[in-house]
Design a protein with these regions (language model features):
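Short proline/glycine-enriched turn/loop segments at secondary-structure junctions
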Residues: 656-658
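Glycoside hydrolase catalytic-domain context in secreted enzymes
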Residues: 1-652, 662-676, 681
Length: 681
């Protein structure tokens, strides 16, 4: 690739650093394009010097564009095609937030593997996934694309996702670097303000997991860090990403984010933005063309920029080589990929991604006479946001899988036939957010369950029938007032193509729910942001001291904490033990716990191991998830589950941003059990 680089003119090099949509080559391919892409100010010559394409609908379209491009390419450097395969291509997996509920990286790997096959078969070589932004504010619309509020879970699942893509040859781009999930007030594109210590301690872990898994690209975020937009932030892109995280791949702007630095008022114009971008370490420009239009003149004044440009172009060429495009620019081998197993993978992942939050009478027997009410009784569009080629027309509605005596998809009580409802034994109310109420640019100020639903639940009380609510949502919602009106509560964050079958199978007990919440459900909106791994404070809450951490009008406690989730099985945890109570870094303890299924129902459960550093040189969380394992238990079976502690489980960043381990006491938590050990030098 270095020899090829030497042959390129400056204009050709800058073309390799520019991404445009396919309609620039084939006019008929102009689909769902908006904003900056519609006016990139490129002439005919420039169009055929660009190096990458944003979005493609099929492998045939890819071939069509590639053929036209290569016919006019001086060096026969193929285009590379990228797009957003977030949770599946044609077969839609659960959303990332739903996947995180499974606490099963093996299934998530398989889901990414299946998605990769379908994406490659559709003409893509790169997916803009995973979104590894740590999230703590459910008002933000993009929490549905995340793996939740825990840094360690984010690390593990980001890594599993990338490895799944990689196993099939699909390249991945982790996003959004960095700390995009901390947008103030939960508003998309808003300001982010955090310290370097906070960045290193919590917010980098997801990106680190993706990079450790082999991510090929990193996308910058729309926000600022230390008052400098991430897209032109040299500290983030060169010091943190390249030096600290050892990333060697391609960096890319988010959609038009380079030119958006003008709106941040940190760049004077296109050319100032281009100069700052290349200096900061931004390789590839998406949806704008300031590199191509501005840098030739800028280089005349500062030839040292040529070195930075060459480094960026070489990385892009190596990316194309990695994708196999130089050997076969049409990647014909991808057409024959076997995707017949995708639906089974989606079902298995969705089964473990549904969460049971309240249970008084589930599962139901098949002979139970059911009234199935609510819009999701017959809704086919249950795929969730970012569902790419997923077709809701071929998706089953819930009424197909639940044997209901009475079905009404209205959400108006007056539309119901109470005589028919009263002839049934149980009400299933399938309600919640629509797919378009979460995702990019879909933030909410109010995440309470709709008052309309509360009134509906209150009126349904007059039937005296047990009520199961199935909540379809893209975020945690406030369910405090609704909970007393509900007998059983199943929640999922959009389960994809097999949603209806999984919901029905769970209600009937064919599937025993084993999901756990990857995000905390607040009791009240005023608690936001609320997350389990909060720092200890100087005045922790005390019932006997009024001058401590509390609200006057609501409890400090969430409605449902991170990691909460019920099962039809009854699991008991006992005999939490350590192999040693005094340890050194060379001989850290093994933690063991006995888990017993005390019920007559086989089930799976995730054992979550938390650690608290009892004393440290900087404030530390009240507890942190450090390891987890998922096991299956037959009725009345017991298993001893072991965790070997590592140095990383005990480490943290100090004020100098050095990762250290300090001697002292550590507390281990598993469910309601605790134990302690001391680390000595």
């Amino acid at each position: 690739m270095k020899e090829l680089l030497k042959k390129l003119t400056l204009e050709e090099k800058l073309g390799q650093l520019t991404m445009i949509p396919p309609f620039f080559y084939i006019k008929d391919l102009k689909k769902e394009v908006f904003g900056a892409l519609t006016d990139m100010k490129l002439n005919e010559k420039s169009i055929f010097q660009t190096g990458s394409v944003l979005g493609i609908q099929s492998h045939q379209e890819m071939i069509q564009v590639q053929e036209k491009y290569l016919a006019r390419s001086r060096h026969q450097i193929p285009l590379i095609f990228m797009g957003d395969v977030i949770h599946g291509a044609h077969t839609i997996m659960p959303t990332p937030l739903a996947q995180a509920s499974s606490f099963n990286p093996n299934l998530i790997y398989k889901g990414a593997e299946a998605a990769a096959k379908e994406a490659l078969k559709s003409g893509l070589q790169v997916t803009f996934s995973p979104m590894s932004d740590l999230v703590r504010d459910p008002r933000w619309g993009r929490v549905v694309e995340s793996y939740g509020e825990d840094p360690y879970l984010n690390y593990v699942l980001s890594k599993a996702t990338v490895k799944g893509y990689k196993s099939q040859g699909l390249l991945s781009c982790v996003k959004h670097f960095a700390a995009y999930g901390l947008s103030e007030a939960g508003q998309d594109y808003n300001t982010v303000d955090l310290s370097r210590l906070n960045l290193f301690q919590y917010y980098l872990e997801g990106y680190r997991g993706a990079i450790d898994g082999g991510a090929d690209m990193v996308m910058t975020s729309f926000n600022t860090f230390e008052y400098v937009p991430a897209t032109t932030n040299k500290y983030l892109l060169r010091d943190v990403l390249r030096k600290k995280l050892k990333f060697k791949g391609v960096t890319i702007s988010d959609y038009d984010s380079l030119l958006q630095t003008i709106y941040h008022r940190t760049s004077q114009d296109d050319c100032d933005a281009a100069l700052k971008g290349i200096k900061a370490g931004l390789d590839l420009e998406m949806a704008s063309s300031s590199y191509m239009r501005c840098l030739p003149d800028v280089v005349k004044k500062d030839e040292e920029l040529l070195k930075l440009i060459d480094e960026a172009v070489l990385r892009v060429l190596q990316l194309k080589e990695k994708a196999g495009l130089f050997k076969d620019p049409y990647l014909i081998k991808h057409v024959s990929l076997d995707t017949s197993n995708s639906m089974k993978v989606a079902y298995n992942l969705a089964k473990e991604s549904i969460v049971l939050l309240k249970n008084n009478s589930l599962p139901l027997k098949k002979k139970t006479k059911i009234s199935l009410l609510g819009k999701y009784a017959t809704e086919k569009h249950v795929l969730g946001p970012w569902s790419w080629h997923g077709d809701p027309k071929v998706t089953d509605e819930l009424s197909k899988h639940l044997k209901a005596y009475y079905i009404n998809d209205s959400e108006c009580f007056d539309d119901y036939d109470l005589d028919k409802i009263n002839q049934t034994d149980h009400i299933i109310l399938a309600i919640g957010e629509r797919y378009y109420e979460s995702g990019e640019a879909h933030s909410k100020a109010d995440i309470n369950l709709s008052p309309h639903y509360l009134k509906l639940l209150e009126k349904l009380q007059q039937t005296n029938l047990p009520i199961t609510v199935v909540l379809y949502t893209g975020r945690p919602q406030i369910l405090t007032e609704a909970l007393p009106l509900i007998d059983n509560l199943l929640v999922h964050f959009h389960l994809g193509s097999t949603t209806s079958k999984v919901v029905a199978d769970t209600i009937y007990g064919i599937n025993n729910p084993c999901g756990r919440l990857p995000m905390t459900f607040p009791r009240h909106q005023g608690q936001i942001p609320i997350y389990y791994n909060r720092l200890s404070t100087g005045r922790p809450y005390s019932e006997t001291n009024p001058y401590t951490l509390k609200y006057l009008d609501v409890s400090n406690e969430p409605l449902f904490e991170f990691g909460y989730g019920l099962s039809y099985s009854k699991f008991n945890y006992s005999n939490l033990k350590l192999s040693t109570n005094v340890a050194t870094l060379k001989s850290l303890p093994t933690v063991s716990v006995t888990v017993t299924n005390e019920s007559d129902v086989s089930g799976k459960t995730s054992i979550l191991l938390y650690i608290k550093d009892d004393f440290a040189s900087v404030a530390r969380p009240v507890k942190e998830l450090k390891q987890f394992k998922k096991i299956s238990l037959k009725p009345h079976e017991s298993k001893v589950v072991e965790f070997k502690l590592t140095k990383n489980d005990l480490s943290f960043y100090n004020q100098d941003l050095k990762k250290i381990v300090e001697p002292g006491g550590f507390t281990i938590f598993i469910e309601n059990l605790t134990t302690k050990f001391t680390l000595v030098k």
